[in-house]
Amino acid sequence: MARAIDQADGLGHYCEQVLRQLLLLDPQTRYIIFLRSDAVGAAWREFANAQTCVIHSHSKLAWDQLLVPAAARRLGVDLLFNPKFSLPLLSRIPGVFVIQSCDWYVNPKNYPWWDNIYIRLMLPLYCRKARSLLCISKSTLEALAARIKITAPVTGITYAGVGPEFTEHGDPAAQRRCREEYSLPERFILTVARVLHTGHRKLPDYPGGNNERLLRAYRLYRQRTTQPLPLVVAGRDVERYLRARGFSADQLQGVHFLGFVPNERLAAAYQMADCFVLATLLESFGLPILEAMATGCPAIVPATGAGPEVAGSAARLIDPYDEGDIAAALLEVTGSPQLRARMAHAGILRARNFSWRQAGERILAVFDELVPGASATTTAAPATGS
Protein backbone atom coordinates (compact mmCIF):
# COMPACT_ATOMS: atom_id res chain seq x y z
CA MET A 1 0.00 0.00 0.00
CA ALA A 2 2.89 2.40 -0.64
CA ARG A 3 0.85 4.84 -2.69
CA ALA A 4 2.23 7.95 -0.94
CA ILE A 5 5.82 6.92 -1.46
CA ASP A 6 6.19 9.04 -4.61
CA GLN A 7 4.85 12.22 -2.98
CA ALA A 8 7.45 15.00 -3.11
CA ASP A 9 6.93 15.94 0.53
CA GLY A 10 7.89 14.90 4.04
CA LEU A 11 5.47 11.99 4.16
CA GLY A 12 6.70 10.51 0.90
CA HIS A 13 10.29 10.92 2.08
CA TYR A 14 9.49 9.25 5.42
CA CYS A 15 7.84 6.28 3.68
CA GLU A 16 10.76 5.82 1.31
CA GLN A 17 13.46 6.03 3.96
CA VAL A 18 11.71 3.75 6.45
CA LEU A 19 11.12 1.12 3.78
CA ARG A 20 14.77 1.26 2.71
CA GLN A 21 15.86 0.66 6.29
CA LEU A 22 13.51 -2.31 6.70
CA LEU A 23 14.87 -3.90 3.53
CA LEU A 24 18.49 -3.29 4.56
CA LEU A 25 18.11 -4.39 8.18
CA ASP A 26 15.91 -7.41 7.49
CA PRO A 27 17.22 -9.18 4.36
CA GLN A 28 15.71 -12.56 5.32
CA THR A 29 12.11 -11.33 5.15
CA ARG A 30 10.17 -11.03 1.91
CA TYR A 31 8.56 -7.60 1.65
CA ILE A 32 5.68 -6.99 -0.72
CA ILE A 33 5.35 -3.31 -1.61
CA PHE A 34 1.86 -2.39 -2.76
CA LEU A 35 1.81 0.52 -5.23
CA ARG A 36 -0.87 2.29 -7.26
CA SER A 37 1.48 2.77 -10.21
CA ASP A 38 4.89 1.49 -11.26
CA ALA A 39 6.37 5.00 -11.41
CA VAL A 40 8.72 4.24 -8.52
CA GLY A 41 8.81 0.45 -8.84
CA ALA A 42 12.28 0.36 -10.39
CA ALA A 43 13.80 1.90 -7.26
CA TRP A 44 13.11 -1.28 -5.28
CA ARG A 45 14.41 -3.86 -7.74
CA GLU A 46 17.91 -3.59 -6.30
CA PHE A 47 16.65 -5.33 -3.14
CA ALA A 48 16.49 -9.12 -3.39
CA ASN A 49 13.93 -9.26 -0.55
CA ALA A 50 11.51 -6.77 -2.16
CA GLN A 51 8.61 -7.54 -4.47
CA THR A 52 6.39 -4.80 -5.88
CA CYS A 53 2.70 -5.35 -6.52
CA VAL A 54 0.97 -2.65 -8.58
CA ILE A 55 -2.79 -2.32 -8.04
CA HIS A 56 -4.49 0.34 -10.16
CA SER A 57 -7.49 2.19 -8.75
CA HIS A 58 -8.89 5.72 -8.90
CA SER A 59 -10.45 5.27 -5.46
CA LYS A 60 -8.13 5.48 -2.47
CA LEU A 61 -10.78 4.01 -0.19
CA ALA A 62 -11.40 1.00 -2.45
CA TRP A 63 -7.65 0.53 -2.82
CA ASP A 64 -7.11 0.54 0.96
CA GLN A 65 -10.16 -1.43 2.04
CA LEU A 66 -10.83 -3.89 -0.80
CA LEU A 67 -8.07 -4.32 -3.35
CA VAL A 68 -4.98 -4.41 -1.16
CA PRO A 69 -6.37 -6.78 1.51
CA ALA A 70 -7.52 -9.15 -1.24
CA ALA A 71 -4.06 -9.12 -2.80
CA ALA A 72 -2.39 -9.49 0.59
CA ARG A 73 -4.51 -12.55 1.39
CA ARG A 74 -3.77 -14.08 -2.01
CA LEU A 75 -0.01 -13.52 -1.58
CA GLY A 76 0.10 -14.98 1.93
CA VAL A 77 1.04 -11.81 3.78
CA ASP A 78 1.53 -12.31 7.53
CA LEU A 79 1.63 -8.67 8.61
CA LEU A 80 0.51 -5.36 7.12
CA PHE A 81 2.51 -2.22 7.84
CA ASN A 82 1.42 1.28 6.91
CA PRO A 83 3.85 4.20 7.37
CA LYS A 84 0.85 6.53 7.29
CA PHE A 85 -2.48 6.02 9.07
CA SER A 86 -4.91 3.57 7.44
CA LEU A 87 -5.47 -0.17 7.57
CA PRO A 88 -7.95 -2.53 5.88
CA LEU A 89 -10.74 -2.69 8.47
CA LEU A 90 -12.15 -6.10 7.45
CA SER A 91 -8.87 -7.90 6.91
CA ARG A 92 -7.84 -10.64 9.33
CA ILE A 93 -4.16 -9.92 8.71
CA PRO A 94 -2.68 -8.09 11.72
CA GLY A 95 -1.71 -4.52 10.99
CA VAL A 96 0.59 -1.79 12.26
CA PHE A 97 0.63 1.86 11.25
CA VAL A 98 2.40 5.11 12.08
CA ILE A 99 0.45 8.14 13.30
CA GLN A 100 1.89 10.99 11.25
CA SER A 101 -0.19 13.97 12.38
CA CYS A 102 -3.09 15.26 14.46
CA ASP A 103 -3.41 18.55 12.56
CA TRP A 104 -6.99 17.77 11.47
CA TYR A 105 -8.04 17.89 15.14
CA VAL A 106 -5.83 20.82 16.22
CA ASN A 107 -6.29 23.04 13.14
CA PRO A 108 -9.36 21.73 11.27
CA LYS A 109 -9.70 25.01 9.33
CA ASN A 110 -6.60 24.00 7.37
CA TYR A 111 -8.56 21.23 5.63
CA PRO A 112 -11.75 20.95 3.56
CA TRP A 113 -14.85 19.74 5.35
CA TRP A 114 -14.88 16.33 3.66
CA ASP A 115 -11.31 15.63 4.76
CA ASN A 116 -12.18 16.48 8.36
CA ILE A 117 -15.23 14.21 8.27
CA TYR A 118 -13.18 11.34 6.83
CA ILE A 119 -10.46 11.69 9.48
CA ARG A 120 -12.87 12.00 12.40
CA LEU A 121 -14.82 8.97 11.22
CA MET A 122 -12.02 6.68 10.06
CA LEU A 123 -8.96 7.42 12.19
CA PRO A 124 -10.58 6.14 15.44
CA LEU A 125 -11.55 2.97 13.56
CA TYR A 126 -7.99 2.50 12.33
CA CYS A 127 -6.69 3.02 15.87
CA ARG A 128 -9.02 0.28 17.12
CA LYS A 129 -8.18 -2.05 14.24
CA ALA A 130 -4.39 -1.86 14.62
CA ARG A 131 -2.58 -4.53 16.59
CA SER A 132 0.06 -1.94 17.39
CA LEU A 133 0.61 1.77 16.80
CA LEU A 134 3.74 3.78 16.24
CA CYS A 135 3.96 7.56 16.18
CA ILE A 136 6.20 10.15 14.54
CA SER A 137 6.66 12.07 17.83
CA LYS A 138 5.56 12.07 21.46
CA SER A 139 3.87 15.45 21.13
CA THR A 140 1.75 14.22 18.21
CA LEU A 141 0.72 11.13 20.14
CA GLU A 142 -0.21 13.16 23.23
CA ALA A 143 -2.22 15.66 21.19
CA LEU A 144 -4.14 12.90 19.43
CA ALA A 145 -4.72 10.87 22.61
CA ALA A 146 -6.30 13.96 24.17
CA ARG A 147 -8.87 14.04 21.37
CA ILE A 148 -9.70 10.43 20.49
CA LYS A 149 -9.67 7.12 22.32
CA ILE A 150 -6.66 5.02 21.34
CA THR A 151 -7.23 1.39 22.29
CA ALA A 152 -4.38 -0.27 20.40
CA PRO A 153 -1.06 -0.46 22.25
CA VAL A 154 1.38 2.29 21.30
CA THR A 155 4.71 0.51 21.10
CA GLY A 156 7.15 3.19 20.07
CA ILE A 157 8.10 6.57 18.66
CA THR A 158 9.66 6.34 15.20
CA TYR A 159 11.44 9.65 14.72
CA ALA A 160 12.60 10.62 11.26
CA GLY A 161 16.25 11.02 10.27
CA VAL A 162 18.19 12.84 7.58
CA GLY A 163 20.20 11.70 4.59
CA PRO A 164 24.00 11.79 4.41
CA GLU A 165 23.92 15.02 2.39
CA PHE A 166 22.73 16.89 5.48
CA THR A 167 26.09 17.23 7.22
CA GLU A 168 28.10 20.05 8.75
CA HIS A 169 31.00 19.14 6.44
CA GLY A 170 29.95 21.14 3.41
CA ASP A 171 31.44 20.67 -0.05
CA PRO A 172 32.70 24.09 -1.24
CA ALA A 173 32.09 23.14 -4.87
CA ALA A 174 28.50 22.09 -4.12
CA GLN A 175 27.93 25.29 -2.18
CA ARG A 176 29.30 27.35 -5.04
CA ARG A 177 27.01 25.60 -7.53
CA CYS A 178 24.02 26.18 -5.25
CA ARG A 179 24.86 29.85 -4.80
CA GLU A 180 25.25 30.36 -8.55
CA GLU A 181 22.15 28.38 -9.53
CA TYR A 182 19.85 30.26 -7.16
CA SER A 183 21.72 33.61 -7.10
CA LEU A 184 22.07 33.40 -3.33
CA PRO A 185 23.43 36.45 -1.48
CA GLU A 186 26.59 36.21 0.61
CA ARG A 187 24.62 36.17 3.88
CA PHE A 188 20.97 35.23 4.31
CA ILE A 189 18.25 33.78 6.51
CA LEU A 190 16.73 30.54 5.19
CA THR A 191 13.23 29.17 5.59
CA VAL A 192 11.48 26.16 4.07
CA ALA A 193 7.82 26.89 3.34
CA ARG A 194 4.81 24.79 2.45
CA VAL A 195 1.67 26.14 0.80
CA LEU A 196 0.27 22.97 -0.83
CA HIS A 197 -1.72 20.12 0.69
CA THR A 198 0.37 16.95 0.64
CA GLY A 199 -1.07 14.17 -1.49
CA HIS A 200 -4.04 16.28 -2.64
CA ARG A 201 -3.27 18.08 -5.90
CA LYS A 202 -6.80 19.47 -6.33
CA LEU A 203 -7.24 20.98 -2.87
CA PRO A 204 -6.88 24.73 -2.23
CA ASP A 205 -3.74 26.13 -0.63
CA TYR A 206 -2.67 24.91 2.80
CA PRO A 207 -2.64 27.79 5.36
CA GLY A 208 -0.92 25.94 8.22
CA GLY A 209 2.56 27.00 7.11
CA ASN A 210 1.99 30.40 8.76
CA ASN A 211 3.80 32.07 5.88
CA GLU A 212 1.89 35.35 6.12
CA ARG A 213 2.85 35.85 9.75
CA LEU A 214 6.49 34.95 9.08
CA LEU A 215 6.67 37.53 6.27
CA ARG A 216 5.15 40.21 8.49
CA ALA A 217 7.67 39.31 11.21
CA TYR A 218 10.47 39.58 8.68
CA ARG A 219 9.29 43.10 7.79
CA LEU A 220 9.45 44.00 11.50
CA TYR A 221 12.97 42.61 11.63
CA ARG A 222 13.99 44.75 8.65
CA GLN A 223 12.58 47.85 10.33
CA ARG A 224 14.55 47.21 13.52
CA THR A 225 18.04 46.80 12.06
CA THR A 226 20.19 48.89 9.76
CA GLN A 227 21.71 45.84 8.04
CA PRO A 228 18.91 43.31 7.48
CA LEU A 229 19.78 39.99 5.90
CA PRO A 230 17.73 38.74 2.93
CA LEU A 231 15.15 36.02 3.58
CA VAL A 232 15.57 33.07 1.23
CA VAL A 233 12.43 30.94 0.84
CA ALA A 234 12.58 27.35 -0.42
CA GLY A 235 9.30 25.73 -1.39
CA ARG A 236 6.83 25.34 -4.25
CA ASP A 237 4.48 28.20 -5.18
CA VAL A 238 5.21 30.35 -2.13
CA GLU A 239 5.48 33.63 -4.03
CA ARG A 240 2.20 32.94 -5.84
CA TYR A 241 0.55 32.10 -2.52
CA LEU A 242 1.66 35.36 -0.89
CA ARG A 243 0.81 37.51 -3.91
CA ALA A 244 -2.68 36.02 -3.94
CA ARG A 245 -3.06 37.12 -0.33
CA GLY A 246 -2.24 40.72 -1.02
CA PHE A 247 1.51 40.94 -0.45
CA SER A 248 2.94 43.65 -2.69
CA ALA A 249 6.45 43.92 -4.09
CA ASP A 250 7.23 46.47 -1.38
CA GLN A 251 6.02 44.10 1.34
CA LEU A 252 8.23 41.34 -0.10
CA GLN A 253 11.35 43.50 -0.22
CA GLY A 254 14.43 41.48 0.67
CA VAL A 255 12.70 38.13 0.05
CA HIS A 256 14.18 35.66 -2.47
CA PHE A 257 11.90 32.83 -3.65
CA LEU A 258 13.70 29.70 -4.86
CA GLY A 259 10.79 27.37 -5.59
CA PHE A 260 11.33 23.65 -5.05
CA VAL A 261 14.92 22.84 -4.05
CA PRO A 262 16.22 19.22 -4.22
CA ASN A 263 17.93 17.84 -1.13
CA GLU A 264 21.49 18.16 -2.43
CA ARG A 265 21.02 21.88 -3.09
CA LEU A 266 18.97 22.38 0.06
CA ALA A 267 21.73 20.91 2.22
CA ALA A 268 24.21 23.38 0.71
CA ALA A 269 21.78 26.25 1.37
CA TYR A 270 21.49 25.24 5.04
CA GLN A 271 25.28 25.11 5.32
CA MET A 272 25.68 28.63 3.90
CA ALA A 273 22.81 30.34 5.75
CA ASP A 274 23.39 32.51 8.80
CA CYS A 275 20.36 30.88 10.38
CA PHE A 276 17.19 28.94 9.63
CA VAL A 277 13.70 30.00 10.72
CA LEU A 278 10.57 27.86 10.80
CA ALA A 279 7.36 29.48 12.04
CA THR A 280 4.77 26.79 11.26
CA LEU A 281 1.82 26.54 13.64
CA LEU A 282 2.13 22.80 14.26
CA GLU A 283 4.94 20.41 13.37
CA SER A 284 4.18 16.72 13.83
CA PHE A 285 7.93 16.14 13.68
CA GLY A 286 9.62 18.96 11.80
CA LEU A 287 12.08 17.43 9.36
CA PRO A 288 13.49 20.85 8.34
CA ILE A 289 14.44 21.44 11.98
CA LEU A 290 16.52 18.28 11.98
CA GLU A 291 18.02 19.08 8.58
CA ALA A 292 19.11 22.53 9.74
CA MET A 293 20.69 21.23 12.95
CA ALA A 294 22.48 18.40 11.16
CA THR A 295 24.13 20.89 8.79
CA GLY A 296 25.21 23.21 11.59
CA CYS A 297 22.70 25.92 10.71
CA PRO A 298 21.42 27.79 13.81
CA ALA A 299 17.69 27.07 14.02
CA ILE A 300 14.78 29.26 15.11
CA VAL A 301 11.80 26.94 15.56
CA PRO A 302 8.22 27.00 16.89
CA ALA A 303 7.64 26.26 20.56
CA THR A 304 4.49 24.37 19.53
CA GLY A 305 4.05 20.77 18.40
CA ALA A 306 7.22 18.71 18.11
CA GLY A 307 9.54 21.71 17.80
CA PRO A 308 10.89 21.52 21.38
CA GLU A 309 10.94 17.71 21.27
CA VAL A 310 13.17 17.63 18.20
CA ALA A 311 15.34 20.68 18.88
CA GLY A 312 15.77 20.33 22.64
CA SER A 313 17.88 23.21 23.94
CA ALA A 314 19.80 23.56 20.66
CA ALA A 315 17.41 26.02 18.99
CA ARG A 316 15.83 29.39 19.71
CA LEU A 317 12.14 28.69 20.37
CA ILE A 318 9.50 31.16 19.20
CA ASP A 319 5.77 31.66 19.57
CA PRO A 320 4.62 31.19 15.95
CA TYR A 321 1.52 33.30 16.64
CA ASP A 322 3.60 36.31 17.79
CA GLU A 323 5.19 38.32 14.99
CA GLY A 324 7.14 40.38 17.50
CA ASP A 325 8.71 37.27 19.04
CA ILE A 326 9.71 35.95 15.61
CA ALA A 327 11.28 39.29 14.68
CA ALA A 328 13.11 39.46 18.03
CA ALA A 329 14.56 35.98 17.47
CA LEU A 330 15.80 36.96 14.00
CA LEU A 331 17.49 40.05 15.45
CA GLU A 332 19.02 38.07 18.30
CA VAL A 333 20.47 35.26 16.21
CA THR A 334 21.62 37.23 13.16
CA GLY A 335 23.21 39.87 15.38
CA SER A 336 25.51 37.57 17.35
CA PRO A 337 28.21 35.41 15.71
CA GLN A 338 29.00 33.91 19.12
CA LEU A 339 25.38 32.83 19.63
CA ARG A 340 25.23 31.33 16.15
CA ALA A 341 28.41 29.35 16.80
CA ARG A 342 27.00 27.94 20.05
CA MET A 343 23.68 27.07 18.40
CA ALA A 344 25.41 25.43 15.44
CA HIS A 345 27.50 23.20 17.70
CA ALA A 346 24.53 22.28 19.90
CA GLY A 347 22.40 21.52 16.85
CA ILE A 348 24.97 19.17 15.35
CA LEU A 349 25.15 17.21 18.60
CA ARG A 350 21.37 17.14 18.95
CA ALA A 351 20.83 15.88 15.40
CA ARG A 352 22.99 12.83 16.09
CA ASN A 353 20.18 11.48 18.29
CA PHE A 354 18.00 10.86 15.23
CA SER A 355 18.52 8.42 12.37
CA TRP A 356 16.53 6.43 9.85
CA ARG A 357 18.27 3.29 11.08
CA GLN A 358 16.84 3.80 14.57
CA ALA A 359 13.36 4.17 13.07
CA GLY A 360 13.79 0.94 11.12
CA GLU A 361 15.04 -0.95 14.18
CA ARG A 362 12.07 0.23 16.26
CA ILE A 363 9.61 -0.91 13.59
CA LEU A 364 11.30 -4.31 13.22
CA ALA A 365 11.08 -4.81 16.98
CA VAL A 366 7.32 -4.31 16.75
CA PHE A 367 7.10 -6.79 13.88
CA ASP A 368 8.85 -9.41 16.03
CA GLU A 369 6.51 -8.74 18.95
CA LEU A 370 3.43 -9.32 16.80
CA VAL A 371 4.72 -12.18 14.65
CA PRO A 372 7.55 -14.04 16.41
CA GLY A 373 10.38 -14.54 13.97
CA ALA A 374 8.98 -11.89 11.65
CA SER A 375 12.39 -10.41 11.03
CA ALA A 376 13.68 -13.76 9.81
CA THR A 377 11.03 -15.50 7.73
CA THR A 378 7.75 -13.59 7.62
CA THR A 379 6.33 -11.68 4.69
CA ALA A 380 5.35 -8.11 5.56
CA ALA A 381 3.61 -5.56 3.38
CA PRO A 382 4.71 -1.97 3.91
CA ALA A 383 1.68 0.17 3.29
CA THR A 384 0.69 3.78 2.90
CA GLY A 385 -2.82 5.16 2.67
CA SER A 386 -4.61 8.46 3.17
Predicted segments, located by residue:
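Carbohydrate transferase catalytic cores enriched for Leloir-type hexosyltransferases
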Residues: 1-386
